[in-house]
Curated annotation (Swiss-Prot):
It comes from the Eukaryota. This is Endoglucanase 17. Glycans are attached at residue 451. Its EC number is 3.2.1.4. GO terms for cellular component: extracellular region. Disulfide bonds: none annotated. It catalyses: Endohydrolysis of (1->4)-beta-D-glucosidic linkages in cellulose, lichenin and cereal beta-D-glucans. The active site is at residues 77, 406, 458, 467. It is found in: Secreted. InterPro entries: 6-hairpin_glycosidase_sf, 6hp_glycosidase-like_sf, Glyco_hydro_9, Glyco_hydro_9_Asp/Glu_AS, Glyco_hydro_9_His_AS.
Amino acid sequence: MAAAGGAVLLLVLATATSVTGQHDYSDALHKSILFFEGQRSGRLPPDQRLRWRRDSALNDGATAGVDLTGGYYDAGDNVKFGFPMAFTATLMSWGLIDFGRSFGAHAAEAREAVRWATDYLMKATATPNTVYVQVGDAFRDHSCWERPEDMDTPRTVYKVDPSHPGSDVAAETAAALAAASIVFRDADPDYSNRLLDRAIQVFEFADKYRGPYSSSLHAAVCPCYCDYSGYKDELLWGAAWLHKASRRREYRDYIKRNEVVLGASEAINEFGWDNKHAGINVLISKEVLMGKDEYFQSFRVNADNFICTLLPGISNHPQIQYSPGGLLFKVGNSNMQHVTSLSFLLLAYSNYLSHANVRVPCGTSSASPVQLRRVAKRQVDYILGDNPLRMSYMVGYGSRYPLRIHHRGSSLPSVAAHPAQIGCKAGATYYASAAPNPNLLVGAVVGGPSNTSDAFPDARAVFQQSEPTTYINAPLLGLLAYFSAHPNLAQSDLLYD
């Protein structure tokens, strides 16, 4: 049984491409970080490297009497959605925490990418028992095609508070601040302490006033970032990061006390801005596998079960498909968000397993840490060009990549090239154009193939496949950092250590 499973896994790892040249993971890492500069909102710093971008949304928050300038636009639009932005910051931080040394010369710019998000999240949580969770009217914004520098749609401010709870977005924000506090512990101790103090306050608010923000703010946040999985996973996720950042026993006790109540054992192999179940189990399992806390053994069992569902030919209950070209595939929009987030968990867990010198039990078979790393690396290589179309899905990497991405700022002339305002409906001409985008959003990874055929239309209108998001790139940073430091996993290690 083990041999058969290994053979299928080897087939998936080797399938559908003869392009096996070494990728420049360090260059891809640099570009993936650079992408975040293209997503910046607010007043841009003098060292801004994507020069076609200019200042934007300088009055955000003014209608509510608060300063909400800064932060990131989530994707190809001009709305600031707090839920995916917080998740983006959490995942960038996790990559730096686990693979910080592998970032090498790119560590400082990666920290700056985190700080751009956390500076905003600190503003969004400056009022006690309140989290400002969105700036902009998604429906009005999505009816326009205009540069962020020009946008004239309403910058409506949305918040959660005791009367309108949002435990999901608040707990994710707490997780982001806590994770970032670890990132800045040595580089900027004062900032680190402020991040952790705020994370503690925000989590207390999230836990005390329970409820989904999708109920409190349904008309504003749905369907774009409705929390379909509920808020319980975010409460555990936030507690896990606070435990990791503070080492306070109260968070350890909170996790164990609420493990069943908040659904930690639910067999869900999802991980993304909405659903944190798999991430919770992998993150907490590190405590067990690193020999720090046997108290969390149940989370390791959950993590093992989750990991097995991702391994082709090994699981008796696979929940993941792979395309003929070897791409991990889950039904829904923007498949690359699943590819990068699940690959990150595979890589992180493989390192925890390696430290403990153990394998993942999968029924009558088992998987080695190297097998997990191989699956993760195969996904990264697919993104960078080892796929049936022989194209990179990262803009600016390789000789062939998406040219017509679904992104307002990239597809419209820059302010330097076209100083006059391009109004809401005037941008439609550029949206419908078959011409390549005039501004290169370097490092952007698009949604990619949307089914198991490995097809990609490179069409601006097909946003499910052509739109980049911050939460596609966020987990990719850690992956690229690791493989830039460890590019060669011997072919003999494909199946077993």
